[in-house]
């Protein structure tokens, strides 16, 4: 499952160390341990670790070179539930690799260009206020099946126009074949409207490769759209909503809808969300999550999580999933 991994979730409050002029680096360890009821596996538990090393070199006021390495070890927790939306945004098979490597040029305070190997979901189709949830749909919506994100970013070039408030515009082209080959392309364009307490984002994506529709015919390309909203109600409460669609019948997924709230009271944070995916052949697939995040130290956070999975497939029992996330930066 393609899922999103937001840097705010992975890095938490990151400790950075200077190494020469303009050079910074940081390390992060993210640990998830989950226990599921009614699991089809013999073992109803999964424990996994994601290590991240990030670095950046600010060459001058305009040029930035940055990248990160990631390594995943442990169990792929997707097998605990086998639901459409997943339960952890770090689940994967074992890997170690250069995850991102890019160059960024800042034209002015509002405009920048970014080229290299990039996780698209760190720039497009995300909801900032929802960054602490561990559920995959809080990153990338399940309908954007071609978006190059965790755990396979892609070569790309993107341009961003981002004034502090008002309308923002951005777009990018990504290698659409094996994440390295531009013989096929993935395009995404996004517009935002940002005020002091509100953020709307609306986007359209298109992949021009050959995708097989469910009746075994061939089509040239697929596309979809998304609409994200978040509002800061006051210093403590924020709410968010997501609505997205896959336009072509190359997957059982059709639309994704999500609502959630976040309550911030230092050193704690509380989050609650409900996510729904409509499908072609099955009833709706639901996922709900509530978490309590406690900042034990500036570089160490503990986060108990409870999830409820309502399967869209007939015959599968609903499931409860208890998880404990540890986020340590050093």
Cite the ranges covered by each PLM segment.
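Transmembrane beta-barrel strands of outer-membrane/channel proteins
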Residues: 27-33, 67-71, 113-117, 171-175, ...
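Solvent-exposed loop/turn segments connecting transmembrane beta-strands
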Residues: 41-45, 149-151, 176-183, 217-220, ...
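Outer-envelope beta-barrel architecture signal
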Residues: 19-27, 61-65, 109-111, 155, ...
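Transmembrane beta-strand segments of Gram-negative outer membrane beta-barrel proteins
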Residues: 19-38, 65-67, 75, 135-136, ...
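Outer-membrane beta-barrel "beta-signal"
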Residues: 318-330
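Detector for outer-membrane/organellar transmembrane beta-barrel domains
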Residues: 193-280
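Loop-centered beta-sheet repeat module
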Residues: 160, 166-211
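Outer membrane beta-barrel
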Residues: 48-176, 191-193, 255-258, 262, ...
